[in-house]
Every structure is written in C-alpha cells, then in structure tokens.
From Swiss-Prot:
Region ranges (Disordered): 104-140, 156-205
GO biological process: response to ethylene
Domain comment, as recorded: Alanine-zipper domain is involved in homo- or hetero-dimerization via electrostatic interaction.
Protein name: Barley B recombinant-like protein D
Coiled-coil intervals: 43-101
Domain of life: Eukaryota
Gene Ontology MF term list: DNA-binding transcription factor activity; sequence-specific DNA binding
Complexes and interactors: Homodimer. Heterodimer.
C-alpha cells in the first residue's frame, strides 16, 4: 500500500498511538508522588499558620506582661516615695526627740525649772541644813564669846562642871614641880586637851537633843543624791565601758565596788592582752583603774554633755593618774 501505512504500517500505528498516549497519560507511581508532595505542602502551610497564631498569641501575652510590669514599676515608685516621706518624718521626729532630750538634760528632771535655779535652791537648802547641823559645834567653839550661854550651861549642870574645876585646881601643882623639861610639853598638851574634852562633855550634856538631831540631819544629807542629773550604771541598759588605747575598743573588767579596770593598758604600756607576769602563774599585769564613784561622776558629766550612753563609754582619757595593783588574775 502507499506510504500512509494503512496496512503495511499497521504495526507502527499502535506504537505511535502508544507514544502519543504516554505524553498525556501519567504513570500511576508519578501520580502518587505528586499527591504526596501536595499533601506535604498543605501540612507545612497548616504548621506555618499554627506557628503564626502561636507567635501572635505570645506577642499578645508579652504586651500584657509588659503592661503589668509597667504597673508594678509605677506601684514601686509610689511605695518608694511613701517610704522616703516616712523616713523624712522619722528623722524629723528623732531630731525633735533628741532636742527634747538635750533640753531635758539641762532641766531638772523635766520640772520646767532651769538647772541653775533649782541647783541654787538646793544649795540654799543644803547650806541651811549645814548651818543647822553645825550650829551647836559652832556655838560650843564660840562659847568664850557667848557669856550668857556659858552661864546657862554652868547653872544648869553644876555637878558635871565641878569635877573639871577640881582637876584644874590640882594640875598647876603638878606643872610647878617641873620634874623634867621633856615632860613639860606633854603636860601642856594634856592641859589643852582636857578643856576641849570638858567642852565636849558640856555640849553633849547640855545640848544632847540638838546634837542628836544635827547628826541625824547630817546622815540624811549624806544619803541624799546631791547630783540633780546623776546617772548610775545599769547593766541591763548600758554596755560595759571600753578602752581604745590600742586603736580598737577593748571591754574593761569590773573592779571593786562599781569600778572598772583596763584590759589593754597600764601606766607604761598599751597592748592587748596584757603581758603575763613571769614570777606568778596565770596572772597578768594590772591595768589602769577607775573607782565606782569616779565612774558615776563621769557618766553624769557625759550625760549632761549629751553623750549617748547606749554605746560603750571610752575610758581612754579618763583613767586615774595613780598607780595600779601589782598583780591581777585574768582567767
């Protein structure tokens, strides 16, 4: 047949048809691969959308947290401002209390009277007591000039004065013998001492009630606390005193009745601890000392000057100038 191949080329037609058909008809395996890729793409897009939504949610939470943080900062600033105002008020109150305390130290126990006026009145009362207490001894001493009192005493008690006069009459005979010149001063002394004893007897016999009253008043005056602002040491509220002669505060030891002894210095050396005595076991050199009365006076003076007694008192410049005991045991 002709070249069109209706019969002769009958075998080639199926091949041409087959070749043309394979261009448009995909194999089954390729179709499955393409579907798998599209499914993967869809899954990736879904994951991306989920990630974007999570990011947006996280950003929203972050913004809310930032807003809460700013609110907390605002509250913190307000609290700090209130605290600063409270601190200022506290400082003002402490300053007012300190001023009132210093003014109270200059007053007599807060009675509203100046210290000078009350101390003056106290001194006047003290002088009155002293004058009353010493009135009878002064009158006895000035009795040669008070003839009326001498006559009154001699008339009231003639029996007590009679032996004295008899003794006076006999003594000139002993002095006129002049046994030795060395005995003469002793006789003179006895002669001068005897009238004083007679005057004592007269005073005690004639003014017994006055002298007893004067002695009682004198004892009461001794027992009184003469210091208006005297401060006594209290272990419960005041710390023990210390000494800073070595450059650091070292607590002192108790000594005697209310006194204190240094633990780091003597009259010649200053070191802590004090050296051990070579000729006495378990004993160190004795430090400088301060008696209880001197320490009480020091506390009173420091309190009057406005010193804070809640802190340890430095005794570096207040020790006694006298020597110390040779040994003291510190264990």
């Amino acid at each position: 047949m002709d070249n069109l191949g209706h019969r002769e080329n009958g075998r080639q037609r199926p091949d041409q048809y087959k070749g043309l058909h394979t261009q448009w008809m995909m194999p089954q395996t390729q179709r499955h691969l393409k579907d798998h890729q599209s499914m993967n793409l869809l899954a990736l897009m879904n994951d991306r959308d989920n990630a974007i939504r999570e990011r947006d949610h996280a950003l929203a939470e972050k913004k809310a947290a930032i807003a809460e943080r700013d609110m907390a900062f605002t509250q913190r600033d307000a609290a700090m401002a209130e605290r600063n105002a409270a601190v200022v008020e506290r400082d003002n109150a402490l300053a007012a209390l300190e001023l009132a305390r210093t003014n109270g130290l200059n007053m007599n126990n807060g009675n509203g009277f100046p210290q000078g006026s009350l101390s003056g009145s106290k001194n006047i009362h003290h002088h009155d007591q002293l004058s009353h207490a010493q009135s009878s001894p002064l009158q006895l001493a000035d009795s040669p000039y008070d003839h009326a009192r001498e006559m009154h005493i001699s008339e009231a008690y003639p029996i007590s004065t009679a032996p004295g006069s008899a003794g006076k009459a006999k003594r000139p005979k002993k002095n006129s013998s002049q046994a030795s010149p060395l005995k003469r001063p002793s006789g003179v002394l006895r002669k001068t001492k005897k009238p004083s004893g007679d005057w004592k007897n007269v005073g005690m016999s004639g003014c017994g009630d006055d002298s007893a009253h004067a002695s009682v008043m004198k004892n009461e005056w001794k027992d009184q606390n003469l210091g208006l602002n005297q401060v006594a040491f209290d272990d419960s509220t005041m710390p023990a005193p210390a000494c800073s002669c070595t450059g650091k505060l070292r607590q002192c030891y108790k000594w005697g009745n209310g006194g204190w002894q240094s633990s780091c210095c003597t009259m010649n050396i200053s070191m802590y601890p004090l050296p051990v005595m070579p000729n006495k076991r378990h004993a160190r050199m004795g430090g400088r000392k301060m008696s209880g009365g001197a320490f009480t006076k020091l506390l009173s003076r420091l309190a009057a000057e406005g010193h804070d007694l809640s802190t340890p008192v430095d005794l570096k410049d207040h020790w006694a100038k006298h020597g110390t005991n040779r040994y003291i045991t510190i264990r």
